[in-house]
Amino acid sequence: MALIKCSECGNEISSSAKFCPQCGASVEQHFCPECGVKLKGTEINCPECGFPLTKKTASNIITENLDKITGAKSENYVTFKDLFKYTFKKHSEEDLDNVFVCGSSSTTPDVKDVNPKKASAWVYFKIFIFFIIAYIPTRIGYINYGNLNFLPAMIMLGAFAVPVTILIFFYEINLFRNIPFYKVIKYFILGGALSLILAILFFSLDINTDISTYSGALMVGLIEEVAKAAIVAFFLFKSKNSNYILNGLLIGAAVGAGFAAFETAGYILRYGLAGGDAVMLQTIKIRGFLAPGGHVAWAAIEGAALMYVKGFEKLDKKHLNDKRFLLICLISVVEHGIWDMPIEAPYYLVPIGLTVAAWLVIIYFINLGLKQIDDAKKLKN
């Protein structure tokens, strides 16, 4: 156990002490209990000796392995709880309006004014409530009154509700506020459609895509993730303002949300025609419930990975061949493949477990994105 000196009385105390036993002064600074080096308080492992500063959890294990893949030294800027702590707090209409006013030269803050500790989201929940309120009368109109005019609206609202909600979450945590909302909508609509078409072209090749087999399910995962990653990369190369990890998360999420929404709308209609209204409603519920861990999350990871390997360089084709980018994308491919595999487990345990794993990766990249804000400030000084 390392010893440090109290800043008030100079008495030697343990580096893990919270108060000086001699004078009672609070030890506000953080030190490694193993080697005594001064810390910022956000580190997971000591940067000097590698001593673990947090308890071993599934999250920490995933973080450590991601650090090995990326070569980064991640820090805990925010936790999952921090990101959602303002969800149920009261906000004014002006607060709501301000969230969507960004992306122009006059509404994009300077990097030095961006506080990485303030990453949180709350508008996403309001958007979800709007979808639910709109969905209920369309369902009543079609199911209770048999009016077919309500069917298209019910399908679209049921398919779009959760993907769009998650997309708004990523829009909110893009603290750089350098991507206007109309571009997010563009990436959502065009990205979703283009990635679906690209996937269909791959599916037309003579390869096994039968998800009743393990190899076929894995091939489906590879095809769809390559299609989404290609479109995400295309948008990132075309965008002049998207230079950061949080931007990659957002644009990736937009493409993934579009893919998920359009695909789900098709499944709802197809299964409904084949199995009736009960099957249609069940499809809406199940795909909505599982949507947070699917296409939106996987594509967001791919976008974040590309912007991470780019760093502060100009995005180049060489970054697409970066081993770190390919390995991170492989996570999405494998997750997608396992998701589609014919694995029997009760209560959707497989997709729920994969959702948790995907979001641990997302939180990892959110923290890297917040750390990048501090790094960008240092470059400007």
Residue map of PLM features:
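Short, intrinsically disordered linker segments that flank or connect zinc-binding domains
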Residues: 21-25
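Short, low-complexity disordered segments enriched in Ser/Pro/Gly and basic
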Residues: 1-2, 28
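Short functional micro-motifs and their immediate structural scaffolds
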Residues: 14, 18, 28, 40, ...
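Hydrophobic alpha-helical segments at protein termini of multi-pass membrane proteins
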Residues: 8, 26, 34, 38, ...
